[in-house]
Regions:
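Hydrophobic alpha-helical membrane-insertion segments, chiefly the h-region
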Residues: 30-40
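N-terminal Sec-pathway targeting helices
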Residues: 9-30
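A cross-kingdom marker for long, charged
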Residues: 230-280
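Charged, low-complexity interaction regions
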Residues: 74-86, 111-117, 216-227, 246, ...
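N-terminal intrinsically disordered, acidic low-complexity segments at the extreme N-terminus
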Residues: 1-10
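Interfacial alpha-helical end/capping and short helix-turn segments at domain and membrane boundaries
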Residues: 99-114
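Immediate post-signal-peptide N-terminus of mature secreted/exported proteins
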Residues: 41-97, 119-165, 169
Length: 280
């Protein structure tokens, strides 16, 4: 009996498969197809997220370089007024261009399918517009800043190293016209702190220029008391320039804080890293 029952069951199964073999085959194909599509989409997501992650990291790296370059610009002008070798900023424009290109590469990636990453990305892009304007405006002033380093790097050190006023006047005066001209070129900068710095320094430079003419006259006439008074006035102006330049270094850092992108990039990086781990 058990054998007969088993045979009947076997026949029913065969009959079922025979009658429904087409449906069963389609079901198998459907399941396999869905699995393949799911794996492809998963791999595509993984690839997209990794591309975003690498691009964001590239932006972060270039942003740090751009930020350091901006800060060095402030230090360079301050060092120029101190009469010590300034930090070179001649490669600043290239660094800013590299940053902009890394952002452009990120913009070309498709991340609209992920709402969280897309939102964070949009926040970064909106704030980056301000940073982009800032570095573009600074790029236009780099030649003038480098010219200041070239024309003014010895101007203020002369009075501190040469104690004889008869020697001070001609060597100092020879540098003044080109130095004043270099600072004047910065007065029209669209960066407010830079324009303000140039205006203040130019006024003090012009004042020193007037003092130098008086110093030469007093030196010729041998008026020792007048000579010492003028030298002290020039030194006072020089000290004021250094204070103003130091204030500019702080102003430029404050401007950077207002448009800082570090947290936005970190958040974008963190979101993308989590997605990669989830997909894997």
């Amino acid at each position: 009996m058990p054998k007969i029952a088993a045979n009947k069951c076997h026949k029913r199964i065969l009959r079922f498969f025979h009658k429904n073999h087409l449906i069963i085959m389609l079901a198998i194909i459907f399941v396999v197809g869905c699995s393949v599509v799911w794996l492809l989409l998963k791999n595509l997501d993984r690839k997209n997220y990794k591309e975003v992650f690498v691009s964001v990291y590239d932006v972060q790296k270039n942003y740090k370089k751009a930020k350091d370059t901006i800060i060095n610009t402030g230090s360079s002008l301050e060092y120029s007024l101190l009469g010590v070798p300034p930090i070179k900023v001649d490669k600043s424009v290239e660094i800013f261009k590299s940053y902009n290109k890394s952002v452009e590469r990120l913009e070309k990636l498709n991340i609209s399918h992920d709402q969280d990453i897309s939102n964070q990305y949009n926040m970064f892009i909106n704030k980056n517009e301000q940073f982009k304007i800032y570095i573009n405006n600074l790029s236009k002033s780099i030649d003038s800043i480098n010219n200041i380093s070239k024309e003014c790097k010895k101007s203020n050190s002369v009075l501190d190293t040469e104690m004889n006023p008869d020697k001070i006047a001609p060597s100092y005066a020879d540098m003044m016209p080109s130095c004043i001209g270099a600072w004047n070129n910065l007065r029209n900068s669209k960066i407010q702190s830079l324009s303000r710095l140039a205006n203040n320094i130019s006024k003090l430079m012009l004042n020193n220029r007037k003092n130098l003419d008086e110093l030469q006259d007093a030196s010729i006439k041998g008026r020792q008391a007048k000579i010492l008074s003028i030298v002290e006035e020039i030194r006072k102006n020089n000290r004021e320039m250094i204070i103003i330049a130091g204030r500019f270094s702080e102003d430029i850092k404050e401007e950077l804080r207002a448009i800082d992108l570090e947290d936005d990039l970190k958040n974008l990086n963190d979101f993308t890293a989590k997605r990669i781990l989830t997909v894997d």
